[in-house]
């Protein structure tokens, strides 16, 4: 079937989004054109501005349209002395939603992966080391993903922290709230048993 070249181009562009295949892209394109052209225009404008104006924070490397993001420039966050190391800006958003953390962040934009040729400098660990040396950091919280690469990255950073006399801690991994033990994989259950804590009254 021959379709409009612009329509084909729109569908191909939508496929760059994660989880969007040919059918989903087609449905999105037709929905925007048939029912919500004003929404499509708003999307186009927001996307154009975001792509041209959003860069990386000079301190933590998260996404921001300023030189330094709002979290890093917050005096109360600076006084906290904690830095939470995460793999992506999306992780910051997830942690902020808990309301349980009041320090600053450092975004790796990935993890160590020697097989893929990704070393310490490729994920900004040289910049993190500069911060450990120059700033009054009391604790680095390692919130990398619980994967083989994430664990290796956390261990590498923990060793780096030790060189500068900075405490390093790892976020806990274990059984999810509301989960059933029989459905939990062995590795997660092992982490849960190893990280158990005493109940006091």
Swiss-Prot record:
It comes from Klebsiella pneumoniae (strain 342). This is Recombination protein RecR. PANTHER family: RECOMBINATION PROTEIN RECR. HAMAP family: RecR (MF_00017). Belongs to the RecR family. It holds the Pfam family RecR_C. The lineage of its organism: Bacteria, Pseudomonadati, Pseudomonadota, Gammaproteobacteria, Enterobacterales. GO terms for molecular function: DNA binding; zinc ion binding. GO terms for biological process: DNA recombination; DNA repair. A zinc finger (C4-type) spans 57-72. May play a role in DNA repair. It seems to be involved in an RecBC-independent recombinational process of DNA repair. It may act with RecF and RecO. PROSITE patterns: RECR, TOPRIM.
């Amino acid at each position: 079937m021959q379709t409009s070249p612009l329509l084909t181009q729109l569908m191909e562009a939508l496929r760059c989004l994660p989880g969007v295949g040919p059918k989903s892209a087609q449905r999105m394109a037709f929905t925007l054109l048939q029912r919500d052209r004003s929404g499509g225009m708003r999307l186009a404008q927001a996307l154009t501005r975001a792509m041209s104006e959003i860069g990386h924070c000079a301190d933590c490397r998260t996404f921001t349209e300023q030189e330094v993001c709002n979290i890093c420039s917050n005096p109360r966050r600076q006084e906290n002395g904690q830095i939470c190391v995460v793999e992506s800006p999306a992780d910051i958003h997830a942690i902020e939603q808990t309301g349980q953390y009041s320090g600053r962040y450092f975004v790796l934009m990935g993890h160590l992966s020697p097989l893929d040729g990704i070393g310490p400098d490729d994920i900004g660990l040289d910049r993190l080391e500069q911060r450990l040396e120059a700033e009054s950091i009391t604790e680095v919280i390692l919130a990398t993903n619980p994967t083989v690469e994430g664990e290796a990255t956390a261990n590498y950073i923990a060793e780096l922290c030790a060189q500068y006399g900075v405490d390093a801690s790892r976020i806990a991994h274990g059984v999810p709230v509301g989960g059933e033990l029989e459905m939990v994989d062995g590795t997660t259950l092992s982490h849960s048993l190893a990280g158990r804590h005493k109940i006091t009254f």
